[in-house]
């Protein structure tokens, strides 16, 4: 029984087939949204750290609830993800969120948890994109056009002395 369970989670195709044919992602986002009723902005923005952004469906559904609670306040999201396929899916969702919430900043990284926790971003490469336009369609086009730039800079290698994943640097 243990081997079968392990095989299920080790096979990306089997896992994706399951999560994409159920409403688990929506249920997770709706459950998280319940905590917003007691949430307050304590500094300059409402901040979210998503420690496994995946394809973006959970965070984007949650962002619609955050917008409902804080419609004018700044929202800053830092998402961690290493899969370029998931990043491309995430970009497809984000145009609607940026259109709905004009004060949204979304940062996606493949830094390790240790680097994030220790604020060690010496090898960090920043790609900044300010969206222009007045429709979610226009925002989606701009985000989807970033795919190649991200792909060129998202390549990761595993350092043999640690588990830290580093973005490929162009010299």
Residue ranges with predicted function:
Residues 43-57, 77-78:
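Conserved class I S-adenosyl-L-methionine
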Residues 27, 57, 88:
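Residues that form or flank phosphate/diphosphate-binding pockets in enzymes
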Residues 41, 61-171:
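Class I S-adenosyl-L-methionine-dependent methyltransferase module
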């Amino acid at each position: 029984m243990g081997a079968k369970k392990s095989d299920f989670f080790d096979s990306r195709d089997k896992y994706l087939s399951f999560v994409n044919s159920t409403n688990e992602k929506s249920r997770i986002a709706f459950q998280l949204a319940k905590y917003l009723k007691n949430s307050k902005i304590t500094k300059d923005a409402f901040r979210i750290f998503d420690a496994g952004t995946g394809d973006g469906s959970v965070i984007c559904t949650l962002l619609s609830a955050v917008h409902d609670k804080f419609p004018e306040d700044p929202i800053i999201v830092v998402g961690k993800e290493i899969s370029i396929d998931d990043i491309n899916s995430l970009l497809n969702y984000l145009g609607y969120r940026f259109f709905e919430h004009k004060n949204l900043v979304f940062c996606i990284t493949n830094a390790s948890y240790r680097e994030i926790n220790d604020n060690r971003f010496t090898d960090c490469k920043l790609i900044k994109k300010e969206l222009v336009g007045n429709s979610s369609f226009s925002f989606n086009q701009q985000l989807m056009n970033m795919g190649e730039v991200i792909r060129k800079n998202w390549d990761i290698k595993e350092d043999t002395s640690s588990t830290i994943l580093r973005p490929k640097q162009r010299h």
